[in-house]
Structures are given as structure tokens and as C-alpha cells.
């Protein structure tokens, strides 16, 4: 099979970076004071203050990979926050559609103590992701967050 013109190429593990998005405007008034706060630690690493706790950053690349994260690995591509840039990147790589998952907040909400705050943050992140995907809803397919504190 030499001709791939009729093959649909899907990135099934795409990521957006909602970590720098100000979610307060997407949260009900009574919860806005509990929105995540971004800050840097004494080594200049990005951290997040949420529920009165400082959430630590990863120090490695994952199981089976040794060594600290490099600045390049710690960063993010512009297309993770700007859907127009992502679509250009997808065109350059020949990707027809991307299934998109959140990162920083998405990996945090289910560790929160408050099931109500978790639900509010899930809704805020889902609203942001929906806006992101509106740039091309046939190609950008967001995976919503669901709070798991209250089965």
C-alpha cells in the first residue's frame, strides 16, 4: 500500500496546556477565590497552589526513565494553548484529527479533598477545552474531565 491519501491520521494522545489559563472567569462567583494560583518555587520551577497545598512538579520523565526533566521537556508547544497554531502543526505533520487531554489541572482535580471544588474545576476546564476545540470541531476533539471524588 503505497498511497496513504485515503488514510485518516489521528493523534489519539494529544495534550493541551490549561495550566496558565485563568479559570476564575469560568467558575461561579462563590468559588473564584479557590481558583488555582500559579507561582514559581525557589528554583524557578512552576508550581500550583490549590486547596491550600502546593502541588509539586514532576522530577523525572516517568517510570523507567532516569534523570531530571530538562527545560525542553518541562516546557510546552504554543499549539497546546493556541488552537490555530496546533492546526498548523497538525497540517505540517499530516494529522487529520487530534483527541485532546488536559495536563496540569486535569492531572490534579481528582486529588482534591473537596468534591465540590473538583466538580467546579472540571466544568471550568471543560468549558475552556470546548472553546479551544471550536477552532475546528471536526479536527480538535476534547476529552472532558469528570470528578471522581463521589462515586
What are these regions (language model features)?
Residues 1-151:
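Helix-coil boundary/capping segments in enzymes
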